[in-house]
Amino acid sequence: MELWNFTLGSGFILVGILNDSGSPELLCATITILYLLALISNGLLLLAITMEARLHMPMYLLLGQLSLMDLLFTSVVTPKALADFLRRENTISFGGCALQMFLALTMGGAEDLLLAFMAYDRYVAICHPLTYMTLMSSRACWLMVATSWILASLSALIYTVYTMHYPFCRAQEIRHLLCEIPHLLKVACADTSRYELMVYVMGVTFLIPSLAAILASYTQILLTVLHMPSNEGRKKALVTCSSHLTVVGMFYGAATFMYVLPSSFHSTRQDNIISVFYTIVTPALNPLIYSLRNKEVMRALRRVLGKYMLPAHSTL
């Protein structure tokens, strides 16, 4: 089998779900709408959190970072997928593939850590309210944000460099929406079994501790909420936590399927559907899940829209 010729004009061929769909035009329109929804909803949420002084709190700072990650994640993948479909041109350069992989891994890894920190924030707020401002100071909050970005970036860099050092076979297609490790290794002209095992082990190591921390935090939160004397306080806590748990379930469900389940459980079609879910659907839904059930966020959005975007006579 002929090895990959690393020239400037060389590139992989990404055959994503749009190319394998029975109704590609309808799917393309749906993905376009979801992407626009992700841009608008995450953009508005970021604007509200940035401009509204009442939302300058740890909980909303972390939520703003989640929106930023979702916005960047979907923008790494979706515009190219749509442009490729419209141009009938599915190639991606070696460098472009490496960059896409690095950015996707960075956003995914950062979100994994950030969701754990968000769970800790809710745990402190509900279970230890008197010490909340001490434990979740501005410095501590920004340290959590920086930790998420730095650790995810370093991990993504190592994975990307090691994955792309393999020789790749000419005329092989990557039957996936984006350049991801499991699918790129399928076109490698070398024995990748040990590296695949390492990716699996590291995937478990990266995902499970964060998920365990989230579950432990919410177990303690649930026990505390059940003993709250105020029905209103109990309802508010449950609404906030249920929003976070919904996002956690969507993120970890997709990540576990892609990186933890053995390859025997995978099929090309399933992987493509899952990739659309976590790169396009989830970023579009996350801000809606948080904002529609959070009165503070909704009030802030109305104030920001009324002040900066709508005419002076707006009734918002």
Curated annotation (Swiss-Prot):
Cytoplasmic face of the membrane: 50-57, 121-139, 220-236, 293-316
The residue spans the entry assigns to the Extracellular side of the membrane are as follows 1-25, 80-100, 159-195, 260-272
- Which terms under GO biological process does the entry name? detection of chemical stimulus involved in sensory perception of smell
**Which key words are in the record?**
Cell membrane, Disulfide bond, G-protein coupled receptor, Glycoprotein, Membrane, Olfaction, Receptor, Sensory transduction, Transducer, Transmembrane, Transmembrane helix
Q: List the disulfide bonds.
A: C97-C189
Give any Gene Ontology cellular component.
plasma membrane
**Where in the cell is the protein located?**
Cell membrane
Query: Is Transmembrane set as a keyword in this record?
Result: yes
Residue ranges annotated as transmembrane are 26-49, 58-79, 101-120, 140-158, 196-219, 237-259, 273-292
Pfam families in alphabetical order: 7tm_4
Topology versus the membrane, per the UniProt entry? Multi-pass membrane protein
Which InterPro entries would you find in this protein's record?
GPCR_Rhodpsn (IPR000276), GPCR_Rhodpsn_7TM (IPR017452), Olfact_rcpt (IPR000725)
- State the PROSITE patterns in the record: G_PROTEIN_RECEP_F1_2
Where would I find glycosylation on this chain?
A: N5, N19
What superkingdom heads the lineage?
Eukaryota
Q: Does the keyword Cytoplasm apply?
A: no
MF GO annotations: G protein-coupled receptor activity; olfactory receptor activity
Question: Which coarse location class applies to the principal site listed for this UniProt protein?
Answer: membrane
Provide the function of this protein.
Odorant receptor.
What protein family is recorded? Belongs to the G-protein coupled receptor 1 family.
Protein name in UniProt: Olfactory receptor 2AG1
What organism does this protein naturally occur in? Answer: Homo sapiens
- Lineage, broadest ranks: Eukaryota, Metazoa, Chordata, Craniata, Vertebrata
